Each structure stands twice: as C-alpha cells, then as structure tokens.
C-alpha cells in the first residue's frame, strides 16, 4: 500500500508546482484587458478573476495526462464545462474543450434565436443592452430558403430530381409549382403519376427539405419549377429550370421562361 500512497504524494505536489500558484493576494490581481464574452471566472489557482474561455475554445483540465495539463488556456466561462475532446484523430495529443451545459434553444429579446444559453450569454456581454431570454424554443420567423433548387437537364425519357431547403419557425411547409410559360403556375404533383413530392425535417435543426421528382421527362416538362416555403409568419420562394434534351444533345424547346410568381 505504501507504493501507491508514495506516488500520490509525489504527483500532487508536482501538479501544484506546474501551476505555480503562490500565496493569493487579490489586491495584486490585474483586471482582464480583453472583452470577456463568457463572463469572469476565478483562475486555475482560485485567486484572480480572468476571462472565461468561450464555447468551443480549448481549456485546461486536471483530467488530462500530466504532460498535457496547464497549457495556459485557462478555465471555462459561465454555463460551460471543460471536457476531453472526442473528435481528435488517432495519435493526436489529448486536448480539452469548453462545452455548454445548457443546450436548450432560446428566443432572445432581440428577436434572434440562440442555440443555447452560452451563445445568448456571449451576445449579452457583447451588446450590453439588457439582452435576455424571452422564452424557450426558437423565435418565430418567416421561412428562408437556405438551399435553392438548381437547374437540371436530362434526355427525353430520363428522370430528374430537384431539392429545396428552408428554415423558419413554425417549421415551414413546402409547395412546388411549375410555370409552363403563360404566366400561370400549376401546383405539383397534381394528378400526374410521373411527378412526386416528398418532404422531411433536416438536415439542420428547425430546417426542412423537400424533393421534386420527375419520371420519364418529355418536352412538355421543359419549364421553370418553383419551391415555395410557407408558415404563419410569411413565405419564401426560389426557382430553377428543367431542360429536356433530345438524343443529339440539343434542347427540345427554347422557350426561355424565367417568370416570377
């Protein structure tokens, strides 16, 4: 038993020595010279206040192997905890990173959505205008197209798929329409068995993705297609062309239709 106790007795002073923590004299503490967006916390010696490390920044953790401790990163700020990184490649030296403990989405008094309490705290210290959380969950917002459909082409008889992504709260609902060139748009999929529309949540939080699929395309399918995202706060739309080619590689129709809704 005396060997493990001896090792502990040797290691603990070594850790304290690495930190070089002398006698604490708060009067000698220097105020932070930078803007502290994660709040003020006691330093690793528990004496002076320093700027806390922000979410995603490296930090010093006693759980790391001794050679990798006390690298001068400092402690984490408000609502943050220093944890080992789990995204390192094999063979990389161990590191620790500040992780937010309060991960619930919040709606700020500035009308912006914050992914967690730590992001709202950063904004509050930066703006210094009394920013606070109004309620849990995202703020209401009109849809915004984050990834519009792109022009697609294929030969007669081939298939085409287009996608469209949007964010908003409440979660938007998608509608697809086709402009056949006379200024009028037709909702899809209508009653055409060769046209299908699918939607699902993602890929990001509070985002939705919709797909339009056209099977066995014909010259009549050469047109402009619109994706429209709607919710109670408004709507957003984007368009792209479908070009139908013949087997000589030329376009079957040169209608040049890019009309708005």
Curated annotation (Swiss-Prot):
Site (Reactive bond): 102-103
Pfam families with a match to the protein in the record: Ig_3, IGFBP, Kazal_1
Top-level taxon of origin: Eukaryota
Residue positions the entry lists as glycosylated: 154
Tissue expression summary: Expressed by the venom gland.
Domain Kazal-like: from-to ranges: 70-141
InterPro entries assigned: Growth_fac_rcpt_cys_sf, Ig-like_dom, Ig-like_dom_sf, Ig-like_fold, Ig_sub, Ig_sub2, IGFBP-like, IGFBP_rP_mac25
Main location per the UniProt record: secreted
Example of a GO cellular component annotation carried by this entry: extracellular region
GO MF term set: insulin-like growth factor binding; serine-type endopeptidase inhibitor activity
IGFBP N-terminal domain sequence ranges: 18-101
Keyword terms: Disulfide bond, Glycoprotein, Immunoglobulin domain, Protease inhibitor, Secreted, Serine protease inhibitor, Signal
GO terms under biological process: regulation of cell growth; regulation of signal transduction
Record-linked SMART domains: IB, IG, IGc2, KAZAL
Disulfide linkage: 21-45, 24-47, 29-48, 36-51, 59-82, 76-98, 100-118, 107-139, 164-227
Localization per record: Secreted
Record protein name field: Insulin-like growth factor-binding protein-related protein 1
Organism: Cupiennius salei
Record lineage: Eukaryota, Metazoa, Ecdysozoa, Arthropoda, Chelicerata
